[in-house]
């Protein structure tokens, strides 16, 4: 691929800037790239200053709002490093003709594995055992098995579906709740689609995978308030 030295790219993401392989690949294509080598969280005026003079940007957790797009009119393309879009004012981007590059579900396996690790950690009460050992004690802490449990997945999107696949190895009974119903997938994976009240009442392990927006901002509070004791 022919290098493009004319296009100026700003990488605000700290983790991207530290990633040796990603840096190499980007610089091979776009040698005129500025990285966040200071490793600071860029917001407000600092973020605007960093983006000034760049046509494209790769961002992660930095807030991009209408004021920023107005302050940096030369910015025409934003590539999202990660999948959450809650830090970007999509309407403001569209109104100003700024393009967005984003790949849904690119980290689905990483998140699904982490959820599985958390579930095993909590159901086997590993934090309690670790605290006892660190304190110099040794006592049997009886946990439970994940195998055969009723697992509720709220949000059967990219991560939810991948997690369901991993849970099949544990012979879990999987319940799911989503505003969209993928009947073909549920049939193949042995998933039962249920209402919100049902999944909250019946799940022994519950995991939530929803995009953060105005409709889901307080969803965890709702779930906790409706969970049965224990």
What would you call each of these model-derived segments?
Residues 1-54:
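N-terminal glycine-/charge-rich "phosphate-binding" loop or analogous flexible N-terminal tail
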Residues 43-46, 63-67, 195-198, 220-223:
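Short acidic active-site motifs
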Residues 51-56, 73-75, 202-205, 229-230:
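Short acidic/histidine-rich motifs immediately flanking catalytic phosphotransfer sites
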Residues 141-229:
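Rossmann-like dinucleotide/phosphate-binding beta-alpha-beta segment
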Residues 13, 61, 82, 208-210:
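Glycine-rich, N-terminal phosphate-binding loop of Rossmann-like dinucleotide-binding domains
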Residues 16-17, 62-63, 178-183:
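Short, polar loop motifs at secondary-structure junctions
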Residues 27, 68-74, 225-229:
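Short, conserved loop/helix-junction motifs that constitute active-site signature segments
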């Amino acid at each position: 691929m022919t290098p493009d030295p004319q296009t100026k790219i700003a990488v605000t993401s700290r983790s991207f800037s530290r990633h040796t392989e990603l840096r190499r690949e980007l610089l091979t294509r776009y040698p005129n790239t500025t990285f966040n080598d200071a490793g600071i969280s860029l917001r407000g005026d600092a973020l605007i200053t960093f983006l000034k003079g760049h046509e494209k940007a790769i961002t992660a957790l930095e807030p991009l709002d209408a004021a920023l797009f107005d302050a940096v009119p030369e910015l025409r393309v934003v590539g999202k490093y990660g999948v959450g879009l809650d830090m970007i004012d999509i309407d403001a981007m569209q109104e100003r003709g700024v393009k967005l590059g984003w790949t849904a579900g690119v980290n689905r396996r990483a998140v699904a594995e982490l959820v599985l690790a958390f579930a095993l950690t909590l159901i086997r009460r590993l934090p309690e055992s670790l605290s006892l050992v660190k304190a110099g004690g040794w006592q049997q802490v009886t946990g439970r098995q994940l195998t055969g449990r009723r697992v509720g997945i709220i949000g059967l999107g990219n991560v939810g579906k991948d997690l369901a696949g991993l849970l099949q190895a544990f012979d879990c009974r999987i319940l799911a709740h989503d505003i969209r119903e993928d009947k073909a997938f549920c049939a193949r994976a042995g998933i039962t689609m249920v209402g919100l009240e049902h999944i909250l009442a019946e799940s022994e392990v519950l995991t939530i995978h929803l995009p953060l927006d105005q409709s889901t901002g307080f969803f965890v509070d709702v779930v906790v308030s409706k969970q049965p004791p224990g």
